Amino acid sequence: MVERIVNSEDVSLLVSGRQSNPHKFLGIVSENSSQDRIILFRPGAHSVVVELQGNIAHAQHHHSGIFSLTAPKGTLPQDYRIYHQNGLLAHDPYAFPPLWGEVDSFLFHQGTHYKIYECMGAIPYNVQGISGVLFVVWAPHAQRVSVVGDFNFWNGLVNPLRKVSDLGVWELFIPGLEEGTLYKWEIVSASGEVLIKTDPYGKRFDVPPHAPSRVVDSDRYTWHDAAWMEKRKHRGDQPLAIYEVHVGSWQWHEGKPLGYRELAKKLAAYCKEMHYTHVELLPVTEHPLNESWGYQVTGYYAPTCRYGTPEDFQFFVDHLHRENIGVILDWVPGHFPTDGFALAHFDGEALYESIENHEPLHPHWRTYTFDYRCNEVVNFLLGSALFWLDKMHIDGLRVDAVTSMLYLDYGRQEGEWSPNIYGGRENLQAIEFIKHLNSVVHREFPGVLTFAEESTDFPKVTQAVAQGGLGFDYKWNLGWMHDTFRYIQVDPLFRSYHHKDLTFSLWYAFNERYLLPLSHDEVVHGKGSLLQKMPGDTWTKFAHMRLLLSYHICQPGKKLLFMGGEFAQGKEWTPDSPLDWHLLDHPDHAYLHKCVARMNALYCDLPYFWKGDGKQGSFRWVDFKDTENHVIAYYRFSGEDRSSALLCVHHFSSGYFPSYVLYCQDIHSCQLLFNSDDCCFGGSGKGNRQPVLCLDQHVSWGIDIELPPLATLIFHVDFVN
């Protein structure tokens, strides 16, 4: 009988919710040489009906929810199905061998299971011709792990997982479940506490907070972007005009944010109109708070459900690709929130979070930092990045808060952190993680870009890993951004004393490959909108806006502008309301909008702005010493070509000079291409006179230009051979 097969201690552990290997005695068990026995566990059930080889049979009830029935010798999982309490007729979850293997354990423990997103979480699966869902989770400190959902009435005793690895990996294949099934993990900690957790590897969640995960087939979507993906592999130096977007507040319809599909069409058309090459999305990874920016991530493998399904998000990316617009994701591997339903103390103890510092919470955000010493945690983060690149076709990752990852003492006081093994402040494990991330991303997905938000002078951020660098493609030039805003907010009368703020960044502009950000961070927390930062009356404010944004385009480095800046959003950005698109009905805003579109078009069309822009040879000063008139001028070159250039002139005072001479030699011809003070952009109309060469015995020594107030002029220059 069943008592001879099943150990009473195993049953006791099962009934009390502490069993780590239910497959040891549940499922198909050999009873003797002539027959098998099917052993089932149905807590609270009075009867269990089984379809065995086409015949209906009632299992015998023993005790404590244990049922059994005899079966022919050699019975297979395909030979019988169980009528479950929810009405589902499906095969026995406890009749199948483990699917997680030794190779999986080895790679996961090494932190190199780069397809971990196909093995962890809830994966639609087919085993021996039987369809269902494979549930896998890492919880090394747990006594017991169960999957709960509507299919078992959220009863954690019904479907306990089996521990399949000494690493603490748990697994259960449940036949008959399908895509869309709701589920959570029920975890019994080492201390006996029962925890209900969402899936760290969940690909879809319901409305937060405390939302259950949903089973998703990430491969179901049919992509139409093959041409884009192939072209991306072979990218060389290219223009990057990035439009930074918060999905929930870009545009609304009938009082709600646009969904992914509607947003795809409107945003793609808008980016083409404005000549943006890429969009960068503030984090769309799942997060608990509706009114947040998305940086408190609880679902690292799931696009937020607020705007649609994962398939809707795939459509969004696909559509932008078909319109030749890239998609960059703001990704947050530096810290995670303390919400108890997600990663925090996942199995009852610190698992994903670091306990290296004396104070576990990050002082700036009151969040946990990841434990980069643990390879399984590193693999979780690498898997997240690679999932978005593989399954969602993302073109780039902007890695948030890199500085906080690089330094152990970031934001901490003395006594709140411990030095590394060399006595230094560098977080050696985080640095290795970053190098690993960039190496594997660039190897597995050629053409994908990575960006570092890094605010210190940490060396070699954009040098290759093989050359001792961190391996990023670009670093945000936050120094340039701070200097620029500090200068432009000064009244023009006093700018002579701040001239170095315009010139200082050019001393280090080629130490790294830089992106120049005018990002969301500068229009929040009381800093005001870009327009509000500008000094002067209304006309002067808009002249400053045209000057700022054209200066941004002309400077060496790739470009990023946060939404609303292109038409001078009047108020500070907030994530819980849409941009003020009605402002485009006002001439000043419409003129600026037109000016930005023209500047972006020039930027994309003229390689002088972007070809080799990370190299010293792409830039040469013409004049940086005119502090009295607040003028700077410089050449931008296209790669190694020195036969021609763009001459960029920026005038930061409100004065007007009908004749202003720049001392520049060997010019053969010079033609005005762009004037931010043109009437068509809302300017005064000054500065449109074509330049006049200054000659001495037929040799040019300078040019005479008309210099309008608060304006940028761009000239195309051919040099004497």
UniProtKB/Swiss-Prot annotation:
Catalyzed chemical reaction(s): Transfers a segment of a (1->4)-alpha-D-glucan chain to a primary hydroxy group in a similar glucan chain
GO CC, sorted alphabetically, is: cytosol
Q: Quote the EC number.
A: 2.4.1.18
Q: Which domain of life is it from?
A: Bacteria
Give the residues annotated as active site: D400, E453
Tell me which UniProt keywords the record has, alphabetically.
Answer: Carbohydrate metabolism, Glycogen biosynthesis, Glycogen metabolism, Glycosyltransferase, Transferase
The pathway to which it is assigned is:
Glycan biosynthesis; glycogen biosynthesis
- List the InterPro entries hit by this protein, alphabetically: A-amylase/branching_C, Branching_enzy, GlgB, GlgB_N, GlgB_N_E_set_prok, Glyco_hydro_13_cat_dom, Glyco_hydro_13_N, Glyco_hydro_b
Biological processes per GO annotation: glycogen biosynthetic process
Top class in the EC scheme: transferase
Pfam families, alphabetically? Alpha-amylase, Alpha-amylase_C, CBM_48, GlgB_N
Q: Which GO terms describe its molecular function?
A: 1,4-alpha-glucan branching enzyme activity; cation binding; hydrolase activity, hydrolyzing O-glycosyl compounds
UniProt family annotation? Belongs to the glycosyl hydrolase 13 family. GlgB subfamily.
- Quaternary structure? Monomer.
Q: Provide the function of this protein.
A: Catalyzes the formation of the alpha-1,6-glucosidic linkages in glycogen by scission of a 1,4-alpha-linked oligosaccharide from growing alpha-1,4-glucan chains and the subsequent attachment of the oligosaccharide to the alpha-1,6 position.
Q: What is this protein's record name?
A: 1,4-alpha-glucan branching enzyme GlgB
User: What organism is the protein native to?
Assistant: Chlamydia abortus (strain DSM 27085 / S26/3)
